[in-house]
Structure formats: structure tokens, C-alpha cells
């Protein structure tokens, strides 16, 4: 199934899903009514209960026991946020007019392995900008470096053509998506399509078919189409850390399929559930993972993708203004360049 066909189908599914999820109760701020509505929405539609081995009934009973009829909205919000945190899911949030409940332990409990000030030293002042990409030549102009900080920042086909043409005399490429928390999946596919000359199976996707925790459709194949523009088949290293999430995780998953690509750095943060939104009777919004996305082996990457080569920034290098991960990528690519000469 081609990507455009799949996303059209997915949009239709989303419309049906949102219609089904919309709570029919009238507006109310009653704590128990809203608590039960939130629990039920997740119970019937969240996609990772079995994978994460979460006993949602037990979670319900534990948090329900803490409810009181006189609980104010702030205490209720905190309680609901704590309940959602049991899912350990960066795509699952509760939104009110005064706060956003979020789970960030998936990256905050790990070494950063990326520092903005350090990256600015490597970019210098003479880098170029094309859409959401910053890019320059490194290592005596032998290696191209691309920094993509967020898949929420757009990249067009013309942007990518200019970038890759700029590197036409380079022998290899570094793509740095560390600290990229995700964004638009279309940009992930558009970028990744520049590294293949043929259609590739990038993975599978499922949707809920019922209210049970294991009620899913059969996995639908999702293919990445090759670009009709400039294509790069020379060696590539993609740099990762734990803050690579959602669309960035998807990009890493796709890039690791290609034979000329090596993933280097730290394990990604994951985020392989396509999120949807629903509404509670008091008007609060809830976002959660609803459709699992699988890799070509039909495995989930919700908890992250291991790099091909594990590298972390050392304290000694950081003190000297050296990015251990970039330097390791340069050394690795130089070895390939020397071997090919």
C-alpha cells in the first residue's frame, strides 16, 4: 500500500475514531464522571496495554480510591495526570486551560548526549539554512553535515535538492537528529526517500477494531517510495540520542533499512504509536497512542531503537568543547572513505 493511499485511509479511520470517542455526556465538572470518562477512553482505545503489561483495571481501582466528590479541578487534574503516567508514553497527555500533564521520563532519566552550545561550535557561523535544515561541509569538505532539530520544521523537495547538490563532491554524510522530538511524518518520509532508488517496506500499521485491549486489525504494510529528485547512495551516519521521538524515531527506523546508513549515538526515545485526541465532559482534551506502528519485522519500537554503534559524549570531551558522537562519526566515515580509495 502506497503512503498516500494509506494516509487517506488513515484519515477516514481517524474521523470514525474521533466520532466514536466523543463523549455524549453533557458538560459537567463532576470529578468522578470525568475520571471515569478518561479511564474508559483509554481502556477502549489505547494501543499498548498488552505490550507494556499495564493492568488498567488495577490502575483504575488504585486511582479511583483517591477521588473525592469535593476534589477541586487542580487536584483532579494532577490525579488524572499521575494515572496517565502509568502508561509511560510520551504521546499521552492531558490538556486543560491551566496545565498539560506529560510523561517525560523516557528521556529525562538518560544522558543528554547533545548540547546546543557544543553544536553551535561545530556549525560555526558559515552554515547554510534550507527549510528546517542547517548544513555545512566538514573535515576538509569530505563530509557533509546536516542538522535537523525538529520534524515540525518543514522541508520541501527543493530544500533537499539544494542541500544534497551542495554536498555533491563530499564522500559521505552525517545527519544529526539528536534532540529531535518529532513532528510531521510526511517530512520524515520525504527526507528518507532521498536515500533509496527503489520502493522499500518501511513497516506496518494497525488500528483498533473493537474495545478490547487486543482488538486490532491485521498489520497493513506501509511502503516508502523512492524519490524522483536527487538521491544519495554514499555512506551516511545518522546521529541519535534519547530525545529522538515520534517522527524522529520513525525516520531512524526507516533509515536503518538502507545498506549505506549507520545509526550512531544513543538509543532513541521511541514513540511508535500514532496519537489521536478526545474530549472529557469538562472540556479537557486527552491525547494518546491509538494506532501501533511496527517495523518491517512487525516489531514495535515504542521503547526506542538501539544504534548500530553506541557512542556517548564523555565528560572529558565536553569539557574540551568536543562532541564525542560527531567526532566518532567523522572517524568512522573516514575509515570507509579511505577503504574506498
Q: What do the PLM-derived regions correspond to, one by one?
A:
Residues 1-28, 341:
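Bacterial Sec-dependent N-terminal signal peptides
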Residues 8, 12, 46-47, 168, ...:
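Proline-centered flexible-loop/turn and helix-kink motifs
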Residues 11, 130-132, 273:
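Short beta-strand-initiation
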Residues 13, 138, 165, 228-231:
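Structural motif
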Residues 20-208, 213-221, 235, 277, ...:
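Flexible, low-complexity junctional segments that flank or bridge functional domains
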Residues 97-99, 308, 323:
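Juxtamembrane/interface motifs at transmembrane-helix termini
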Residues 186-320, 327:
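Conserved acidic, small-residue-rich alpha-beta core segments centered on
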Residues 328-336:
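C-terminal alpha-helix
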Amino acid at each position: 500500500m502506497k503512503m498516500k493511499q494509506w494516509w487517506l485511509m488513515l484519515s477516514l479511520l481517524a474521523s470514525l475514531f474521533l466520532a466514536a470517542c466523543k463523549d455524549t455526556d453533557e458538560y459537567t465538572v463532576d470529578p468522578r464522571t470525568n475520571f471515569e470518562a478518561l479511564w474508559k477512553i483509554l481502556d477502549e482505545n489505547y494501543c499498548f496495554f498488552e505490550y507494556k503489561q499495564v493492568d488498567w483495571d488495577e490502575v483504575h481501582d488504585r486511582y479511583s480510591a483517591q477521588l473525592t466528590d469535593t476534589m477541586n479541578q487542580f487536584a483532579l487534574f494532577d490525579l488524572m495526570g499521575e494515572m496517565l503516567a502509568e502508561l509511560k508514553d510520551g504521546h499521552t497527555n492531558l490538556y486543560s486551560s491551566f496545565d498539560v500533564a506529560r510523561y517525560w521520563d523516557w528521556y529525562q532519566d538518560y544522558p543528554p548526549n547533545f548540547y546546543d552550545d557544543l553544536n553551535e561550535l561545530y556549525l560555526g557561523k558559515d552554515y547554510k539554512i534550507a527549510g528546517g535544515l542547517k548544513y555545512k561541509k566538514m573535515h576538509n569538505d569530505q563530509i557533509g553535515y546536516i542538522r535537523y532539530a525538529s520534524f515540525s520544521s518543514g522541508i520541501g523537495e527543493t530544500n533537499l535538492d539544494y542541500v544534497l547538490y551542495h554536498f555533491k563532491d563530499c564522500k559521505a554524510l552525517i545527519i544529526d537528529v539528536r534532540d529531535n522530538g518529532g513532528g510531521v511524518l510526511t517530512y520524515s518520509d520525504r527526507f528518507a526517500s532521498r536515500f533509496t532508488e527503489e520502493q522499500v517496506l518501511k513497516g506496518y500499521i494497525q488500528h483498533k477494531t473493537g474495545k478490547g485491549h487486543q482488538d486490532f486489525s491485521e498489520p497493513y504494510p506501509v511502503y516508502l517510495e523512492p524519490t524522483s529528485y536527487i538521491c544519495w547512495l554514499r555512506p551516511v551516519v545518522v546521529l541519535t540520542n534519547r530525545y529522538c521521538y515520534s517522527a524522529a524515531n520513525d525516520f531512524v527506523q526507516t533509515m536503518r533499512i538502507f545498506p549505506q546508513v549507520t545509526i550512531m549515538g544513543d538509543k532513541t526515545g521511541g514513540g511508535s504509536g500514532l496519537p489521536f485526541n478526545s474530549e472529557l465532559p469538562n472540556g479537557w482534551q486527552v491525547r494518546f497512542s491509538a494506532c501501533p506502528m511496527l517495523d518491517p519485522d512487525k516489531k514495535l519500537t515504542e521503547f526506542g531503537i538501539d544504534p548500530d554503534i553506541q557512542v556517548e559524549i564523555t565528560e572529558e570531551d565536553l569539557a574540551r568543547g568536543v562532541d564525542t558522537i560527531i567526532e566518532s562519526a567523522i572517524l568512522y566515515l573516514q575509515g570507509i572513505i579511505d577503504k574506498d580509495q
